[in-house]
Amino acid sequence: MDSTSSLHGSSLHRPSTEQTRTDFSWDGINLSMEDTTSILPKLKRNSNAYGIGALAKSSFSGISRSMKDHVTKPTAMGQGRVAHMIEWQGWGKAPAIQPQHSHEAVRRDTDAYSDLSDGEKEARFLAGVMEQFAISEATLMAWSSMDGEDMSVNSTQEPLDCNYSDNYQELMESQDALAQAPMDGWPHSYVSQGMYCLGSSDAWEASDQSLIASPATGSYLGPAFDDSQPSLHDMGPSQPASGYSAQEPPPLLGVDTDWASEVGGVELARGPVEEEKRPLAPEEEEDAGCRDLESLSPREDPEMSTALSRKVSDVTSSGVQSFDEEEGDANN
């Protein structure tokens, strides 16, 4: 009786979940193990939720299959017919007929399409699909070919740029070698020949700051001077070059003029007073030629100027050594 009363109580209070829980908790105290078998049908009934989900899923798949068979296929055929009409009527193209006959042409085309059999309609549908696929495939192939051409152009431009840079570097190196070759021979050749423009006092004026810096920055007589002026051998001993004869060495900086005149027998310029007494026409011409050649000569780098100054100092030191040898011979 207790079990039946508890079952009836639970059935009466079933709409309220909280009350059923309290009833179950209250009745569970008085329930025995034999009476628990009456709860199993409820648990089994609650476990059918998975079965309901599977049924809903299967029913949904069945409904979707039926919709596909009865709704989707006819709709696809209808869309295909619309596509056939678009292809048949030639929409998107320039009208080849007059506007007043357009309605008649559309009606005629519609009647002609409707008169086609199902096989002809299917054939036209497949032809339209194949045409669209062919157009899209051709477009993709064109794009891929354009991408390939761009890649090939870029790949060909890279080695061209590398070759251009290599050739440019080789050209610059050859130009540097050509520029250094004549400059290496300038101090030895022109200083030994007495053509280094240091004999005139005008070359060392305080106003010309570029010539005061060092003898290496002085102007050399280049090939243009050989063409415009007579050579040292043609001038002879009577005509001095840069204020001195061809056999006489140029004056050395820092050497006493009296000692140099006694040892080498060289008549050095005593100053601007003696230069004013004799005619200055040849010296002025030579100074003008030196300055013109200096303006035409290329600017030297600091490294090149230091190298040239060292070479000039070597030449001058060799000249001092030769003067010492001559002095020793004269004393003996």
From Swiss-Prot:
What UniProt keywords apply to this chain's record, in alphabetical order?
Phosphoprotein
- The name of this protein is Protein FAM131B
Residue ranges, compositional bias (Acidic residues): 323-332
Phosphothreonine-modified residues are 316
Tell me the organism's taxonomic lineage.
Answer: Eukaryota, Metazoa, Chordata, Craniata, Vertebrata
Q: Where is this region: Disordered?
A: 1-22, 221-332
**Record-stated family:** Belongs to the FAM131 family.
Q: Which InterPro entries match?
A: FAM131
Q: Where is the composition biased (Basic and acidic residues)?
A: 272-281, 288-302
Per the record, residues carrying Phosphoserine are 47, 114, 117, 295, 297, 313, 317-318, 322
